[in-house]
Amino acid sequence: LLVLLTPEKSAVLVGKPGVGKTAIVEGLAYRIQRGEVPDLLKGYKIINMKTASLLGTMPNGESKVQLMIDELKQEEKIILFIDEIHMLIGATDTSSVDFANIFKEGLGRGSIKVIGATTTEEYERYILRDKAFTRRFQKILVPEPTREETIEIMMGTLPKIEKTTGAKLKYTNFIKEKIMAFLVDLTSEYKRIFEIGSRYPDISLTLLKQAFSYAMFDNSKEVNIFHIQKAIENSKNVYPDVIKKYLIVFDEKF
């Protein structure tokens, strides 16, 4: 929020895959909608732009990025969210410097704010060397949540998953929290398949969502222990030997 309140500055969220960079922006949108932000940010709306839609040029040769900015200049109080923003570095016709400079007028007026997101590796590889970009976009490091924070995130996300799927995890909050803790422990750092590269909370949330998928496949409005067990058995994010051990523990606990 402090970066967005700073004139001529926008933010770029930097963190490992799966740490919740997009969720931060969703949380900001929720707070803006509820008016739980400083007065200067009230009335802003967030537009989520797909990076792929901004790459390249139009048939007439005009840069898609430039075209987007020209359209946004007609609007007021816009926060543009661009995931994988590193893909736009060097995507304009002349050089990578152009991308940051294209935003100069909008950022200067304060009517356009940008939140970018990228991984730590892509930031160091593409963005760090772009001085024009780093002048206008302040790096915000997004660390991986702790075990306890991830359990809390999962408990907070559960109602949203239930609303989206129409299925319910019908247990007491005590049992629900035990289930979340189990899924979080199952997906801790040294149990993850290295090539997957995902982190808390996404890797744990993926397991939970898979359990809901199995319930929907069964045409069930309730997610039960067997659906969770099935999600664990078929997980592609955790080493097979870890899954075998945890399934035994799962049977004992639940």
Label the predicted regions:
Residues 1-254:
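AAA+ P-loop NTPase nucleotide-binding core of proteostasis motors
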